[in-house]
């Protein structure tokens, strides 16, 4: 329920879910759903109700490779197979048996393949020597990250629990005050009713006494004459 003395956009929520009762009573859920349905019928957003927002840039994080893949998928083209030509050692064709340039290219290709394999062997040797320790360090870092994340999670859960307890205590305290004030209001209303009824009775008695005195005065005057 919105307050009348609030700044535009501010809302005061007067619900006390930890204190209020009767949510499971028959018809309550249907009444709430009817209120929601009524509000949704009143809210008619226009087609450009998000016009105040900047236009989204869906391609902000796209790379050329991603863009090419999206275009390939849109065109329903098959993915290109991995080329294994660089790992082959073809000899010069029959027409190039006496071509020195062709043979030089084959030799260069063989040297590149050999160097590539040598680098792979060196990488395997380095991995065999240092890979185990590097993997252990990596796992230790992961463990520390998990422990830190779990501690943060526990802090958040405790904060949420404390907040819920605080909300519950505040609502129960407010509910008790409201119940006490309601009881006082009922008592005051009852007392006011009793006072008003007593006043009416006294006014009637005063009126009757005045009438009796008036009739007695008339009777005395009549007797005097």
Swiss-Prot record:
Segments passing through the bilayer: none
Modified residues (Phosphoserine): 94
Gene Ontology biological process: alternative mRNA splicing, via spliceosome; mRNA splicing, via spliceosome; oocyte development; ovarian follicle development; protein catabolic process; RNA splicing; RNA splicing, via transesterification reactions; spindle assembly
Main location: nucleus
Function: Required for pre-mRNA splicing as component of the activated spliceosome. Component of the PRP19-CDC5L complex that forms an integral part of the spliceosome and is required for activating pre-mRNA splicing. May have a scaffolding role in the spliceosome assembly as it contacts all other components of the core complex. The PRP19-CDC5L complex may also play a role in the response to DNA damage (DDR).
Effect of residue 139 to S: In a colorectal cancer sample; somatic mutation
Family to which the UniProt record says this protein belongs: Belongs to the SPF27 family.
Modification sites for N-acetylalanine: 2
Annotated tissue distribution: Ubiquitously expressed.
Protein name as it appears in the record: Pre-mRNA-splicing factor SPF27
